[in-house]
Amino acid sequence: MSLKERKSINECDLKGKKVLIRVDFNVPLDDGNITNDYRIRSALPAVQKVLTEGGSCVLMSHLGRPKGVSMAEGKELGSAGGIPGFEQKATLKPVAKALSELLSRPVTFAPDCLNAADVVSKMSPGDVVLLENVRFYKEEGSKKSTEEREAMAKILSSYGDVYISDAFGTAHRDSATMTGIPKILGNGAAGYLMEKEISYFAKVLGNPPRPLVAIVGGAKVSDKIQLLDNMLQRIDYLLIGGAMAYTFLKAQGYSIGISMCEESKLEFARSLLKKAEDRKVQIILPIDHVCHTEFKAVDSPLITEDQNIPEGHMALDIGPKTIEKYVQTIGKCKSAIWNGPMGVFEMVPYSKGTFAIAKAMGRGTHEHGLMSIIGGGDSASAAELSGEAKRMSHVSTGGGASLELLEGKTLPGVTVLDDKE
């Protein structure tokens, strides 16, 4: 898809307005305590912009995957004094407290997102209200009919005048809060986080500084078929790691021991290698591996001499020669996009490949102006763990959304926003 720039929060008249902001506060919780507040902090610039301009904020988010209830069931529960769809592990109440501390001002928590008209009507400029988890209602979901989503969006739309989307992580969802509200209000703009995501993906998918390398890893070829197919039209180099590399190696006739392999995808691997050759895209596969006989961490795993993996062994990371080759390739490029780890990085003996990629991208960005983009999910976690995330050009907050963009799909939560004026 070609990503067009969208109307920015900077172009909106916010003074005296009640501004509905769809944020992504889907933070990790441990017994009600937030273990990583990165997503909350990422939303602060948009919230502060509204408050500085003399508006008030009504914030909407999901957290986790609660079961949820229908609006009809919610009405009954609400009239009986209950909180519709409530699940302790998915409540946004701890987020309201954390947000209040970060903003240094009170944040009012509305315990039922569809029964908050009273709370919202009492708001003055400078006030912030956080609605309870929108997924406590099933109508938020993209699997519901348009009419059902619309019914929920109508109620939420009545709380505000202006709609801002700052939740790139759910931009691939056609849901009540992502697409329903802007359609009803007739306006929709991107917050700063959404704007940054669109800007970087537009660059890498449009006209990036060249050469451009894609580093693709993860377990299954089947999860990345569309991504590989789409990116092959845009890149100069493709580095493949993770368990998916062994399907490609087997397709080339190498022995892969007991490493993971998708037999049904061998033909696809061969055709992709041929397509790359025709398009003069250089696909680089691992030339050595870090192996063991079982899927567990050991002090001295076997490092192979070449591409072949011995019988009875499984590869769990790329080897030192491969690391050197991949790092050299990244060093030759002016743009890099990374999606998926090189090995089982959660286990220390098999983390070197993934962390070496993170380091090469961080150093390239910091020292040579490389445009580096991390496509969310496991790659973002690995970049954080390696300490290199802060040196990258952009670490995406949306695993699923960034994957769909790289596959060439359009994102409903982006296309619904107004075009830049």
Curated annotation (Swiss-Prot):
The keyword Magnesium applies. One of its GO terms (cellular component) is cytosol. The keyword Glycosyltransferase does not apply. Its EC number is 2.7.2.3. This is Phosphoglycerate kinase, cytosolic. Pathway: Carbohydrate degradation; glycolysis; pyruvate from D-glyceraldehyde 3-phosphate: step 2/5. Its cofactor is Mg(2+). InterPro entries: Pgk_euglenozoa (IPR027250), Phosphoglycerate_kinase (IPR001576), Phosphoglycerate_kinase_CS (IPR015911), Phosphoglycerate_kinase_N (IPR015824), Phosphoglycerate_kinase_sf (IPR036043). One of its GO terms (molecular function) is metal ion binding. Belongs to the phosphoglycerate kinase family. AMP binds at A219, K220, K224, A243, A315, E346. (2R)-3-phosphoglycerate binds at V23, D24, F25, N26, R39, S61, H62, G64, R65, R135, H172, R173, K220. ATP binds at A219, K224, A243, A315, E346, D378, S379. Mg(2+) binds at A219, D223, D378. PROSITE patterns: PGLYCERATE_KINASE. Its main location: cytoplasm.
